[in-house]
Amino acid sequence: MKASMFLALAGLVLLFVVDYASESEEKEFPIELLSKIFAVDVFKGEERGCKGFDDSCTPGKNECCPNHACSNKHKWCKVYLGK
């Protein structure tokens, strides 16, 4: 009787330890994933010859990227919809 109680208690302790370990791994997973994503150098700004959306521009000059146009009113590049 004592041996079976001891085995049951040891099994419960083992179950709690495994559950705690899996929960801590689940909590660390999003942090590891984000650190791997943002460690890539893809997010560094690249210099380009044209100005993209919401960049300041001078109306009349062709400074904006293709499919963008310089707004006369706001003086920034906006998406050109063909109007």
UniProtKB/Swiss-Prot annotation:
User: What domain notes does the record hold?
Assistant: The presence of a 'disulfide through disulfide knot' structurally defines this protein as a knottin.
Q: In which tissues is it expressed?
A: Expressed by the venom gland.
The listed locations are: Secreted
Annotated family: Belongs to the neurotoxin 10 (Hwtx-1) family. 15 (Hntx-3) subfamily.
Residue ranges of the propeptide: 22-48
Give the protein's function: Lethal neurotoxin. Selectively blocks tetrodotoxin-sensitive voltage-gated sodium channels (Nav). Does not affect tetrodotoxin-resistant voltage-gated sodium channels or calcium channels.
Protein name as catalogued: Mu-theraphotoxin-Hhn2k
Q: Which residues carry this modification: Leucine amide?
A: 81
| Main subcellular localisation | secreted
One annotated GO molecular function is: ion channel inhibitor activity
Quaternary organization = Monomer.
Which Pfam families has this protein been placed in? Toxin_12
Signal peptide (residue range): 1-21
Disulfide bridge partners, by residue number: 50-65, 57-70, 64-77
One cellular component GO annotation, for this chain's record?
Answer: extracellular region
On the tree of life, the source organism's domain of life is: Eukaryota
Keywords, A to Z, come to: Amidation, Disulfide bond, Ion channel impairing toxin, Knottin, Neurotoxin, Presynaptic neurotoxin, Secreted, Signal, Toxin, Voltage-gated sodium channel impairing toxin
